[in-house]
């Protein structure tokens, strides 16, 4: 797909999505520059947020669908790489905040709501902000969005309690969130990671090179899809649990449900969900670089591979002291990356799988919902009035 002409891709209904997957390494470098250019404003805003009360500031990462999985991906990493003396990181979907506010927000907790949104126009994004303002006594809003003209950015422009950071080049035009997911994940990680800016820059350059490698290894990725399969499952631990959920959603969306999907944590999969696996199932496991966690990822790979039921059991991993010795997509020759950054080249692998599979089943990746019942920006949501 990545070597096809624009004309060939257009005929397949895949030109937009293919280009948006391929451009991500460049966008990650851009995102690093956005972080650098806004660092002073970010630090000043976070200082104001911390001043709202004593103790740790509740940092709520929120979004819907893929935007929700941004928080699910970065929060586990930041719970040990961020400053947890100052911040309590919590991923909570906008759909949960809006539908049951008191179950997820505490009125007395000083709170920073970090909203992730591609367009900034989904009803839940806007309603979550309104609900938080109504319920929480001391609250500020950090908006990370790709839509400069979206309602989230426009309506918060004059709000002294809000800071909006824009990643406009990541505002995907295709149906699926690809660059928007990876860039919002990266920017939030850069903001709260306590590593030095020099170290962050090195990690960003490494993931950009790994992303470029994903594109060049497309034939290898395509080989995993050569057989007759109708199920795909993704597993991962820590931050890769959120990544697994995002990866299975991409398969589901781009194939319009023609391939069944599941996801879980590496350890959780044994507790019932493993029943999903049959001889027409592809199992992908994202292998963590943390030496302790990695053992559990490799354990489930060895177990499922040893069962000899799944059509393929594939590790997505970086070369390390221990690796899965069975089928794998392995990145070699790079420094070992922490999970908050390694998630990005890993998701490019998953996006490539989803793109190739969409075409395999005869669907059009750029417009995968032929009935129009699933939309790029969610429609048909009724937001009911809320009073604290």
What does each model-found stretch correspond to?
Residues 17, 23, 61, 65-77, ...:
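Conserved phosphate/anionic-ligand binding catalytic regions in large, soluble enzymes, centered on
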Residues 53-205, 237, 286-325, 329:
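Glycine-rich phosphate-binding loops that contact phosphosugars or nucleotide phosphates
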Residues 1-13, 144-146, 227-233:
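An N-terminal domain-start capping segment
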Residues 20, 31-50, 54, 157-284, ...:
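Active-site phosphate/pyrophosphate-binding segments
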Residues 2-18, 25-26, 30, 157-161, ...:
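Phosphate-moiety recognition in structured ligand-binding domains
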Residues 7, 11-24, 29-65, 101-113, ...:
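Glycine/serine-rich loop-strand microenvironments at binding/catalytic pocket rims
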